[in-house]
């Protein structure tokens, strides 16, 4: 069996790091045979912090025996220059795209930290925080209160990716995303939980290949009926049958990234 290639990746930002991480992930997913160790360095706003980041990056490179990869979204040219002195392969989104965009638009950018997320007082920021809180409070069917406020309600059997997808929708798009598990009792009744019936237009289903679900569940609860391949096949077949019968839009998440799943949901439910 070939040895898996391992590389360390740093995401360095003067803000939360969500933007640079999302951009980096979109590139990293193109290299399926490499195992990436990911380290985030957010809120880098001073020379001292930049120097500390360089020391950390260099130390990691010495430990790995291979230089790290560094993705940055540092607006301040001085801080960006310091980080680029690290013994690493550095990719700056602002250095790569901002200058050509300034040339095309014929105007200099503001070089203002945090413009992509807005200030803490902005309505967009508040909306995103509210969405994250709502999503956490409505994870895995914890409660069915206030479902009328949801932008989307994900349904699937356990371990199909409902929670990470819900959080991604909340964090990246400011959507209130609830999610509910489909359980054996639902299959016995042959219909959706009653609390979801009146919110049918907001429902979106996730499914997965039974073999992949078996692998995931074995890591959580090995040698159990819950994780058995036979049970995984049964649950997936019943869930897909129910979603077809109820007219719920759904997709197979087996080989898709959270970004791809989320984009499909946005398009199918016309949320963007």
Curated annotation (Swiss-Prot):
Domain of life where this protein originates: Bacteria
Entry EC number(s): 2.7.11.33, 2.7.4.28
Keywords: Kinase, Nucleotide-binding, Serine/threonine-protein kinase, Transferase
Catalysed reaction, written as an equation: [pyruvate, water dikinase] + ADP = [pyruvate, water dikinase]-phosphate + AMP + H(+); [pyruvate, water dikinase]-phosphate + phosphate + H(+) = [pyruvate, water dikinase] + diphosphate
GO function term, MF aspect, one: ATP binding
InterPro entries xrefs: Kinase-pyrophosphorylase, PSRP
Binding-site residues for ADP, renumbered to this chain: 156-163
NCBIfam families noted in UniProt: PRK05339.1 (NF003742)
Family statement drawn from the similarity comment of this UniProt entry: Belongs to the pyruvate, phosphate/water dikinase regulatory protein family. PSRP subfamily.
Role noted for this protein: Bifunctional serine/threonine kinase and phosphorylase involved in the regulation of the phosphoenolpyruvate synthase (PEPS) by catalyzing its phosphorylation/dephosphorylation.
Protein name as annotated: Putative phosphoenolpyruvate synthase regulatory protein
